Amino acid sequence: MSHFAAIAPPFYSHVRALQNLAQELVARGHRVTFIQQYDIKHLIDSETIGFHSVGTDSHPPGALTRVLHLAAHPLGPSMLKLINEMARTTDMLCRELPQAFNDLAVDGVIVDQMEPAGALVAEALGLPFISVACALPLNREPDMPLAVMPFEYGTSDAARERYAASEKIYDWLMRRHDRVIAEHSHRMGLAPRQKLHQCFSPLAQISQLVPELDFPRKALPACFHAVGPLRETHAPSTSSSRYFTSSEKPRIFASLGTLQGHRYGLFKTIVKACEEIDGQLLLAHCGRLTDSQCEELARSRHTQVVDFADQSAALSQAQLAITHGGMNTVLDAINYRTPLLALPLAFDQPGVASRIVYHGIGKRASRFTTSHALARQMRSLLTNVDFQQRMAKIQTALRLAGGTMAAADIIEQVMCTGQPVLSGSGYATAL
């Protein structure tokens, strides 16, 4: 049995996806230890998974609060500050992980695509590592918009020029992080590199996004595996919570995720739009609103405001999901064929929203939209059965992709052979 280190950026959705994968590996007899700054310890709620804190000098307890605040407001100067914090974390991990891997006697490393330090250190120490895309894959292709870009997919010269120009702007913004990657690659004696997408595993790359939900890709590596959602494999069945009282009024679930749930003004717009169509609204703010804000929103008829909801239960009962475009929420909605109205706010959410529209499984709107315009889009989604019908193909693809168990099989195969695991190959699981 193997001992894996898990390296993720300090954000809930990324840690949660890797924790679900870690739990499956633990159930198979392996050990998994997350290694990061102290503050992400509270994000790991499984007693069977280890945690090893590093970087207390530069990232002391409480330091993550500032990073999460920047991530919740990632526009203008805050974006550059957030990128600088990402660079600081990668720098810290590149310095701390070699000793941690040796002290913990790590056999292999599971690395989120967004945190390259785990990949660099694993390669330098000769450890096998597996890259995981918990959000949109960051793999680049010449005629494909970057994951963070809001563009529709196109093959015209104008589209390709737009993609290329936006890539240059993105690379300029990320230059501080790029310098950290380049400096540590040189210090460790690795082949020159400076960008995230140059740090992915040559053995296996795992993605939650299936091709049926992506733009047409032509240049993914042979070791790239689209396994679908990384969910708990030994989780209890969906709760019996009933969130909607009427079967006659439209049932709408709205959530902006764990980082963006503070957007009271946007929630007010959603509430007004639901009033206009006389819909029932379940609004989950993930603990980000004040009591007075919750009370004000809940004054609206047929509106429930909660910190957290059982998302699977809510989406299985809802007829429409209003979301920021987070990968996990979108995949859950597809699983229940619940049409999507995306209000992308940051990170890869514009890219996810573009894919929702491209595949005809929902609509997108600006965060500055009016309640009347939002209501008009909601009516279209609720009355046009084509959205649900188009979801059926993607739903089937997600359920056949293999999920967490397939990802664990791939990881075990890497550890068993030390060779690249090619897409479509059988996965040996006995170690």
From Swiss-Prot:
Q: Which domain of life is it from?
A: Bacteria
Q: What is the lineage of its organism?
A: Bacteria, Pseudomonadati, Pseudomonadota, Gammaproteobacteria, Enterobacterales
Q: Which Pfam families match?
A: UDPGT
Is this entry keyworded DNA-binding? no
Give one GO biological process term: carotenoid biosynthetic process
Protein purpose = Catalyzes the glycosylation reaction which converts zeaxanthin to zeaxanthin bis(beta-D-glucoside). The reaction proceeds in two steps with the monoglucoside as an intermediate.
Q: Which cysteines are joined by disulfide bonds?
A: none
Family listed: Belongs to the UDP-glycosyltransferase family.
Biological pathway:
Carotenoid biosynthesis; zeaxanthin diglucoside biosynthesis
Q: Which residues form a coiled coil?
A: none
Q: Which organism is it from?
A: Pantoea ananas (Erwinia uredovora)
InterPro entries, A to Z: UDP-glycosyltransferase, UDP_glucos_trans, UDP_glycos_trans_CS
Q: What class of enzyme is it?
A: transferase
Tell me what this protein is called.
Zeaxanthin glucosyltransferase
Record's catalysed reaction(s): all-trans-zeaxanthin + 2 UDP-alpha-D-glucose = zeaxanthin bis(beta-D-glucoside) + 2 UDP + 2 H(+)
Q: Which UniProt keywords apply?
A: Carotenoid biosynthesis, Glycosyltransferase, Transferase
Which terms does the record give in the GO molecular function aspect? UDP-glycosyltransferase activity
EC no. given is 2.4.1.276
